[in-house]
Curated annotation (Swiss-Prot):
This is Uncharacterized lipoprotein MG149. GO terms for cellular component: plasma membrane. Residues 1-23 form the signal peptide. It is found in: Cell membrane. A lipid is attached at C24 (S-diacylglycerol cysteine). The lineage of its organism: Bacteria, Bacillati, Mycoplasmatota, Mycoplasmoidales, Mycoplasmoidaceae. Residues 150-161 have a biased composition (Basic and acidic residues).
Length: 281
């Protein structure tokens, strides 16, 4: 139990934020939002599954890259498959990250009153209690740009950009009756890994084959915003989408001008119900 709590506490400090417009709150808002978060967790499982490469895909890539030298191909295949199997064993020996994500996201929605926030000046405060019910919720989306740059060497070097844009759901925002907007999202960080294998040919030539593999890492993040006045969540998630997709804070800053926004870090869970610096707002 202590380790379980430590894992949750360890995930919280790395907090930051991540368009489906929501309508008015339903009569059973809490259960609706809980179900939506379960769906979000399941969607993450799908993303992870799509990001993993099967042994067959690894073999096909290696075969294509090394078709000119069959003996080197065979050696590289062996290295790639062995590495893939080793990675699988390593992952299986650790805790189930997907299960932890689901447990964590449900723990958050079932224990809002345990969230401890840090206000300006470092004050610790609990802003959500059992009486502060969920008002509404909506999915957060983000445009993902895929840039394809082509370099040409003429009299002057220049680039041609070809952008492909996709929209994907990356999280969920919840609003509360006291003006709190809680953002639960996941971040995807791409990391290119190099797996190398080498073999010596009959003619004493040393060749090295390198496979580039992109690995996606997904992590859960929390962020909270406190407004003096509750307002429709569609306005919030629209501004958030514009900020994250287009690197423009204009709409988000307008929320501050209209409703006096305060950004809050979630720094802890109040497991022992220890005292905090301020009372609930």
């Amino acid at each position: 139990m202590k380790l379980y709590r430590s894992l949750k506490a360890a995930l919280l400090p790395g907090i930051c934020t991540s368009i489906l417009l929501a309508s008015c709150a339903s009569t059973n808002t809490y259960q609706d939002q809980r179900n939506a978060l379960i769906s979000l967790a399941s969607n993450r499982d799908t993303l992870i599954a799509n990001a993993k490469k099967s042994k067959e895909e690894v073999q096909k890539e290696v075969t294509k890259m090394n078709s000119s030298t069959s003996s080197m191909m065979t050696a590289t295949q062996s290295v790639a498959i062995t590495t893939h199997q080793t990675t699988e064993k390593t992952n299986n020996s650790k805790y189930d990250l997907d299960k932890l994500f689901k447990d964590y996201i449900l723990y958050v929605v079932d224990n809002f009153s345990g969230l401890v926030f840090k206000r300006t000046g470092g004050h610790r405060i609990q802003l959500i209690d059992k009486d502060k019910e969920i008002l509404d919720g909506g999915n957060l989306t983000k445009h993902t740009h895929h840039d394809h740059n082509h370099m040409h060497n003429h009299e002057h070097e220049h680039e041609e950009h070809h952008d492909e844009e996709e929209t994907e759901v990356v999280g969920r925002a919840l609003s509360f009756t006291n003006g709190i907007f809680l953002v639960i999202d996941y971040k995807k960080d791409s990391e290119r890994k190099n797996m190398s294998g080498s073999t010596t040919m009959m003619h004493q030539h040393h060749h090295e084959a390198e496979e580039h593999k992109e690995e996606r890492k997904l992590s859960l993040n929390l962020k909270a915003y406190k407004f003096n006045t509750p307002f429709n969540i569609s306005e919030f998630i629209s501004a958030w989408h514009h900020k994250e997709s287009h690197n423009s804070d204009t709409e988000f800053n307008n929320l501050h001008n209209k409703y006096d926004k305060e950004e809050l870090d979630i720094i802890d869970y109040n497991f022992e119900e220890k005292a905090v610096d301020e009372t609930i707002a």
